[in-house]
Amino acid sequence: MKVLWAVLAFAFLTGCRADVEPQLEPEVREPPKWQAGQPWELALGRFWDYLRWVQTLSDQVQEELLSSQVTQELTVLMEETMKEVKAYKAELEEQLGPMKEETQARLSKELQAAQARLGADMEDVRTRLAQYRSEVHTMLGQSTEELRARLSSHLRKMRKRLLRDAEDLQKRLAVYRAGVQEGAERGVSAIRERLGPLMEQGRLRANTVSALAVQPLQERAQAWGERLRGRLQEVGSQARDRLDEVREQVEEVRAKVEEQATQMRLQAEAFQARLQSWFEPLVKDVQRQWAELVEKVQAAVGTSAAPVSSENH
């Protein structure tokens, strides 16, 4: 009996523990990589890859999210995508033959709806990132882990929605193109002649779009180079100004030294003249007295020499 009660108690406790354990969040599978072929698909692929990079929420991403850099980049990519979609639709309507107006109106309406959904979802991504930036600025240095978690979850869901929108738009474009081709009563040779330029235009547009993708990086590098060149010119100008200032100071010092040297030379000449005026009379007086003394000695010697000579004779 005790064993039975023990088994029942264990089962009861196990069931309670199972009830209070939190339900794990289901693992979200990464959507497959977007397959691109047409120019609008390539443009959407760049938007997709950029959004994948933003979703990593790396240090660089978080730093650029605090500014308007990310939203500006997304705006450019979004505008390029919608522009390419409109251009591709216009090319289909221009290059391929007519169809029934009723069918064309229906397909065009469905295509516009799919295009609008894609644009709205891309706009939602940009709005959500702008909202995240505003919320981070409001936190004033507090922890933003919860905000980043919500943003990551939202971006993951938005990427799924964008993938569904893109696939739906891709299918409707294919249907639209097929409907146009079915309505056009042309031979295989005529289709080949018409589609050849269209495919060439698509290839050229794809190359142009790929070049435009590199253009922002080139513009950034050129802007950085211009800023560096401007800074170097500014430093060089400051150095030249400082050198000119030092040169002027040296010239001023040299002029002052020359002026002082001239004054000292003039003072020395004046002092020399003054000394000469002082000692010249004294020198002349000494010379005169010396000459008189010599004359007296010579006279005395001559007088004493004369009697001695006479005595010898």
UniProtKB/Swiss-Prot annotation:
Residue numbers spanned by region LDL and other lipoprotein receptors binding: 154-164
Keyword field contains Repeat: yes
Compartments (UniProt record): Secreted; Secreted, Extracellular space; Secreted, Extracellular space, Extracellular matrix; Extracellular vesicle
Disulfide-bond pairs as recorded: none
GO cellular component: chylomicron; extracellular exosome; extracellular matrix; extracellular space; high-density lipoprotein particle; intermediate-density lipoprotein particle; low-density lipoprotein particle; multivesicular body, internal vesicle
Annotated spans, Specificity for association with VLDL: 274-286
Region entry Lipid-binding and lipoprotein association, spans: 206-286
Signal peptide range in chain numbering: 1-18
BP GO annotations: acylglycerol homeostasis; cholesterol efflux; cholesterol metabolic process; chylomicron remnant clearance; high-density lipoprotein particle assembly; intermediate-density lipoprotein particle clearance; lipoprotein biosynthetic process; melanosome organization
PTM info: APOE exists as multiple glycosylated and sialylated glycoforms within cells and in plasma. The extent of glycosylation and sialylation are tissue and context specific.
GO MF terms, alphabetically ordered: amyloid-beta binding; cholesterol transfer activity; heparan sulfate proteoglycan binding; heparin binding; identical protein binding; low-density lipoprotein particle receptor binding; phosphatidylcholine-sterol O-acyltransferase activator activity; phospholipid binding
Keywords, ordered alphabetically: Chylomicron, Endosome, Extracellular matrix, Glycoprotein, HDL, Heparin-binding, Lipid transport, Lipid-binding, Oxidation, Phosphoprotein, Repeat, Secreted, Signal, Transport, VLDL
Ranges where the record places region Homooligomerization: 262-313
Sequence repeats: 76-97, 98-119, 120-141, 142-163, 164-185, 186-207, 208-229, 230-251
Stored InterPro entries: ApoA_E (IPR000074), Apolipoprotein_A1/A4/E (IPR050163)
UniProt cross-references to Pfam families, sorted A to Z: Apolipoprotein (PF01442)
Protein name, UniProt field: Apolipoprotein E
